[in-house]
Amino acid sequence: MPILTTHLLQDVIEIAQQAGEHLRCFYQRSVTVRMKEDNTPVTEADLFVSQFLTEKLTALTPQIPILSEENCHIPLTERQTWRSYWLIDPLDGTQQFINRTGQFSVLVSLVKDHQPVLGVIHAPMLGSTYYAMQGFGAYKHHDGQHLKLAFHDIQADNALRIAVGSAAAAEKVRSILNKNLAYEFHICGSSGLKSTLVADGVCDCYIRLGCTGEWDTAASEILLAEMGGIIFDLNYQPLTYNKRESFVNPNFVMGITQDFPWDKIFHSN
């Protein structure tokens, strides 16, 4: 595994931002869309940027394998030999890209021993880049400024602010929550961008009931971890990476703090 340095992190940030510029070019014109085997859309932008990221990361760290959402047919028997690898989603929020909402991002993370240790989330249409590295902290670059992202308390007397992907998702989440508490839902596309709402203090958590891949959560996990946050499944267990044949995550919660009694929002008293 490469040594975690600010130089490595800066190189990955630049690669993610370059990938974002390619997405911006595709965004300005009509793109070809087809459905994958899992019935999710993929565009020529996904495929082009996946190849771009693969080439750039290979040049940066030739010894580190790469797993992309668009090139994930690598058997577990081979992946089990990887101690470290790059995990990428070239276009997180493909449907948002197709719908021209601007709510999509590039996700790049470095995973070591089944846990992310470096992550970059770049939102090209928002002009924002979020990045973190183990032991380094979490930061946001926007409008020429680099801002250190800080932990924020959850106000017990206020409604819990929850990021979700749609109004339908909000109702699905509401159905499993403690009905004695108040909630405020914020709708946003792209799994990565929902996690940045938590990092920015707009939301207290992001709850996902539905299909996501490991590439959707890795960069967010290290971002929130460096802020003192937490990601867990509905059995209060951490997410893991590259341990199963499938890349599908369980339902999960991304929270801004480990010190909140998360179990109370799922149980009526």
From Swiss-Prot:
Transmembrane segments: none annotated. The keyword Metal-binding applies. It is found in: Cell inner membrane. One of its GO terms (cellular component) is plasma membrane. GO terms for biological process: 3'-phosphoadenosine 5'-phosphosulfate metabolic process; phosphatidylinositol phosphate biosynthetic process; sulfate assimilation. Its main location: membrane. Its cofactor is Mg(2+). SUPFAM superfamilies: Carbohydrate phosphatase (SSF56655). GO terms for molecular function: 3'(2'),5'-bisphosphate nucleotidase activity; magnesium ion binding. It is an enzyme of class 3 (hydrolase). It is a peripheral membrane protein. It catalyses: adenosine 3',5'-bisphosphate + H2O = AMP + phosphate. Mg(2+) 2 binds at D89, D92, D216. Its EC number is 3.1.3.7. Mg(2+) 1 binds at E69, D89, L91. Substrate binds at E69, L91, D92, G93, T94, D216. Keywords: Cell inner membrane, Cell membrane, Hydrolase, Magnesium, Membrane, Metal-binding. InterPro entries: CysQ, CysQ/Inositol_MonoPase, Inositol_monoP_metal-BS, Inositol_monophosphatase-like, Inositol_monophosphatase_CS. It comes from the Bacteria. Belongs to the inositol monophosphatase superfamily. CysQ family. Converts adenosine-3',5'-bisphosphate (PAP) to AMP. This is 3'(2'),5'-bisphosphate nucleotidase CysQ. It comes from Aggregatibacter actinomycetemcomitans (Actinobacillus actinomycetemcomitans). The gene is cysQ.
